[in-house]
Design a protein with these regions (language model features):
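A bilobed periplasmic-binding-protein/Venus flytrap-type ligand-binding module shared by bacterial periplasmic
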Residues: 131-138, 174-179, 253-267, 272, ...
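Mature extracytoplasmic/periplasmic domains
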Residues: 259-320
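Periplasmic-binding protein-like
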Residues: 128-130, 190-199, 236-262, 298
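A ligand-binding cleft/hinge motif common to bilobed small-molecule-binding domains
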Residues: 89-91, 218, 223-241
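Extracytoplasmic ligand-binding site segments that recognize negatively charged/polar headgroups
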Residues: 33-42, 77-79, 83-216
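Early extracytoplasmic/lumenal segment of secretory-pathway proteins
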Residues: 25-91
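Paired acidic/hydrophobic, glycine-rich loop segments that form the ligand-binding mouth/hinge
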Residues: 80-83, 205-206, 223-228, 243
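Conserved C-terminal helix/tail region of periplasmic/extracytoplasmic solute-binding proteins
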Residues: 316-346
Length: 346
């Protein structure tokens, strides 16, 4: 009996050893804003990273940082990596919702300007630009090319839509009022509000989401509207007879972080590093039209030239724009939003 049991025990141990790697395969849960954007990001970035690292990928979506707060407050978060706008990152980091970044692991972050990374967050994957767009049917000889043109309804008559939020709109108002790009911050709040208050009578629709802005474009309800570049590029690709300019665009960074108490922190840290890899970020342009954030992405040679020139982070386009200052907004968002809401009720 003893002689029979020993070989059997050895066989069981061997099977267990073979099974262990599969059972122990690391898992990482990555969270973004969902929709078509996250679907594209998953194919271009998340899935290739998971394959490269040999980890099991899970995904979820969020709406606001309140969702992250609930994860942390539960005491047993299920999320690991979250991707956000940089303003949301600053707010969440201030609340202590993120793990400290181990920069000895996230070495790709060194490629980015220091103002885009912090102790608890790193740069994200893409930039998004708030740009001026117009109907080519209304303006057959070229539409408004600056925020001054947007606010000038005599020079460029036509139905205007405007974003019902202070972020982006205050910057646009100051640029329209003659403030130089490098002097936009700190925002002269009184001056910006005065410009917008005088403009209110000329606005046909105050939209509340960028999806609504695209609906207005497709329905032909307006002739001039500021919107995110990815939205208008997609609308044009689907047949909208519109055009846009990156001139004086307001370009906003994204960021990524690890949720406080993340169940797979070590794996998440490696995943975070790969998200900043320029070659992997270049792959995003095969699926979506927002410009990758890595400063080295265009040097990879992996982005088709005809695609590169249409992206907001392409050097010639980037230098035409104003980089939104998330630190100013983190310090001023609440009082400015209150003032905006009061103005819209006047």
């Amino acid at each position: 009996m003893r002689k029979t049991m020993l070989p059997l025990a050895a066989a069981l141990l061997a099977c267990a050893a073979l099974a262990t790697p599969g059972l122990a395969q690391p898992t990482v849960t990555v969270v973004d804003y969902g929709g078509t954007w996250q679907a594209a990001e998953s194919k271009a970035l998340f899935q290739p990273i998971a394959k490269k690292l040999g980890v099991t990928l899970r995904e979820d979506s969020l709406q606001t940082i309140a969702d992250i707060r609930l994860q942390v407050q539960s005491g047993k978060p299920t999320w690991d990596v979250v991707a956000l706008g940089i303003g949301e990152c600053l707010a969440a980091a201030k609340e202590g919702l993120f793990e400290p970044v181990d920069y000895s692991v996230v070495t790709n972050a060194a490629d980015f300007p220091p103002e885009l990374r912090g102790p608890n967050y790193v740069p994200g994957t893409v930039w998004a630009s708030f740009v001026l767009t117009w109907s080519k049917e209304k303006f057959k000889n070229g539409g408004p090319q600056s925020w001054a043109d947007y606010f000038d309804t005599k020079k460029f008559p036509g139905a205007r839509a405007a974003y019902n939020a202070p972020r982006f709109m205050l910057e646009a108002a100051l640029l329209a009022d003659g403030v130089a790009k490098d002097k936009v911050y700190p925002i002269d709040i009184d001056r910006a509000f005065a410009k917008i208050r005088a403009f209110r009578k000329d606005v046909a629709v105050w939209y509340t989401s960028f999806g609504q802005a695209v609906d207005l474009i497709n329905a032909g309800e307006v002739d001039v509207v500021p919107v995110l570049d990815g939205r208008i590029i997609d609308a044009i690709a689907k047949g909208a007879k519109w055009d846009f300019t990156f001139n004086q665009g307001i370009i906003n960074a994204a960021c990524s972080a690890i949720v406080k108490g993340a169940p797979n922190k070590a794996t998440a840290m490696k995943f975070l590093n790969e998200m900043l890899d320029p070659e992997l970020q270049a792959n995003l342009t095969n699926y979506f039209v927002y410009g990758p954030m890595s400063p080295k992405v265009y040097a990879t040679g992996l982005i088709k030239p005809e695609v590169a020139v249409k992206l907001n982070s392409y050097p010639a386009n980037f230098k035409m724009q104003v980089v939104l200052d998330p630190h100013w907004w983190a310090d001023n968002r609440v009082p400015v939003q209150s003032r905006w809401d009061a103005m819209m009720k006047e």
